[in-house]
Amino acid sequence: MAFELPNLPYGFDALEPHIDKQTMEIHHDKHHNTYVTKLNAAVEGTDLESKSIEEIVANLDSVPENIQTAVRNNGGGHLNHSLFWELLTPNSEEKGTVVDKIKEQWGSLDAFKEEFADKAAARFGSGWAWLVVNNGNLEIVTTPNQDNPLTEGKTPILGLDVWEHAYYLKYQNKRPDYISAFWNVVNWEKVDELYNAAK
């Protein structure tokens, strides 16, 4: 069965003014759609067609060598963006078990946000910043390109796309401003759901 571009759970303009409508349209309809198209082309005729994208990305070493790079890049792009859309909401509310755990581990939500923002800003070139569950504990990691923490056995519960295509139309070269705006649209309810499933 072919992989499909998921619908956004909100309108393209729902995250304004933090993430603009034009960026959302291009990011979802063009960038994410291209990852899906190229992923389907790469796995066509293989047994990967019947597997979930999570299973594929978690087991990249078992992907045939001749398509491994295409699957890593485009499969990662599809998985990362599918998760990213769900982690955003126009109705952000900082609450839940995961928020309590963050405060316990970092001392405060602000201290966590500062470390996450620093690592996201320091990610050289294109990539992602993540909050992951690793052996029951929370950890902030970054990955290059479209790599996903699942490949390293870590479960992502919050992710931020720091590719320039995610913010350049509105924020140009001011990645830290985009990262700061991100906190206004985090879907903590979804983060909490993922945390409780992973811990």
Swiss-Prot record:
Matches recorded under InterPro entries: Mn/Fe_SOD, Mn/Fe_SOD_BS, Mn/Fe_SOD_C, Mn/Fe_SOD_N, Mn/Fe_SOD_N_sf, SOD_C_sf
Q: Name one GO molecular function term.
A: metal ion binding
Keyword annotations from UniProtKB, A to Z: Iron, Manganese, Metal-binding, Oxidoreductase, Stress response
Q: Which cofactor does it need?
A: Mn(2+); Fe(3+)
Top-level enzyme category: oxidoreductase
Q: How is the cofactor bound?
A: Binds 1 Mn(2+) or Fe(3+) ion per subunit.
Keyword set includes Iron = yes
An annotated GO cellular component of this protein is: cytoplasm
EC numbers: 1.15.1.1
Q: Which reaction does it catalyse?
A: 2 superoxide + 2 H(+) = H2O2 + O2
Q: Which SUPFAM superfamilies match?
A: Fe,Mn superoxide dismutase (SOD), C-terminal domain, Fe,Mn superoxide dismutase (SOD), N-terminal domain
- Asked if the Swiss-Prot or TrEMBL record annotates the protein with the keyword Manganese, the reply is yes
Residues the entry annotates as binding Mn(2+): 27, 81, 161, 165
- Positions that bind Fe(3+): 27, 81, 161, 165
Q: What does this protein do?
A: Destroys superoxide anion radicals which are normally produced within the cells and which are toxic to biological systems. Catalyzes the dismutation of superoxide anion radicals into O2 and H2O2 by successive reduction and oxidation of the transition metal ion at the active site.
Quaternary structure and partners: Homodimer.
Q: Which family does it belong to?
A: Belongs to the iron/manganese superoxide dismutase family.
Q: What is this protein called?
A: Superoxide dismutase [Mn/Fe]
